[in-house]
Amino acid sequence: MKVVLFYDQGRAHSVAAICEVLCAQGCAVTPHAIEQVWNDTSPCSTPLALVQDATHVFFLYAHEPMRDPAFIFFSGVACGRGMHVLLLATTTEVRDIHVFRDLVFLLEEETFEDFFRVEHERFVRQKKKRVARTALLERGYPCFEENFIATVMDGNIDIVNLFLDAGFSAALKDARGTPVLSLAVREGQDEMAAQLIARGAPVDQLSDDRAYSALMEAAQIGNRTVARLLLHAGADPNVRGSNGQTALVLAVGRKDHVLIRLLMDHGANPYLEDKLGLSAQGYAKLFNDPTLCTLVGV
């Protein structure tokens, strides 16, 4: 984030302190005395060169800036180039400025430091997105949701991280309404599931087809590794699918003693009934399996 600071002589005494504040927020600052810049008649000098690489133009005036042609010129150039134009309000006249309200951010002395902190964080996020999108295109991955979903299912962690850096959501669902985390579990992509969880994928997000959570998907296929990972990440073991079944019921159906014990240790409720009126305990009795019955507390 590169800030060009233009100031008049009436505020020259404040420049060093303001530059120190901006540098502390991670900004590269180049100060220019507006009178010197505007009156420079050197044939090698051009005002446009001063803002060539800038991302933000910051004005600091002791008097009304609307009367200054330098302010009008540089703010116009900055707006035309898509830069952010900032003006530190120090007088009543400046605070009452209306003509440039839609083009200029008016900052207060008491809060401008907080503004630059937040702005720098926003700038870094946007830059990270741009870099990631460029990297995706260079590797042959146009920035479409379908490509993101396909790389999740393929287990390409490096590319998925680029998609996430580029602004794609770890909570995205495919066209059928299945969350990308559930897709990773269904495809047996354990490392991908772990990465999505680390990048903020909601662990209890349900699929639209059968209202299964990722934990239920793991229980259905007996993936203890991912089930343990999800439970440690705070997944609810008592989420119920469209048929009323829970991950515990699915584990009982597979007679997976290890997974049943894992779910019970994390608070799975063996009394919850599905739409057939059977709970995990009910299925254990139905299977006439003493070990299952013991595990679910029959």
UniProtKB/Swiss-Prot annotation:
- Identify the Pfam families for this entry: Ank, Ank_2
Which stretches are ANK repeats?
143-172, 176-205, 210-239, 243-272
Q: List the disulfide bonds.
A: none
SUPFAM superfamilies on file: Ankyrin repeat
Is Repeat among the key words of this record? yes
Q: Does the keyword Repeat apply?
A: yes
Q: Which keywords label this protein?
A: ANK repeat, Repeat
**Which named protein is this?**
Putative ankyrin repeat-containing protein TP_0502
Organism from which the protein derives: Treponema pallidum (strain Nichols)
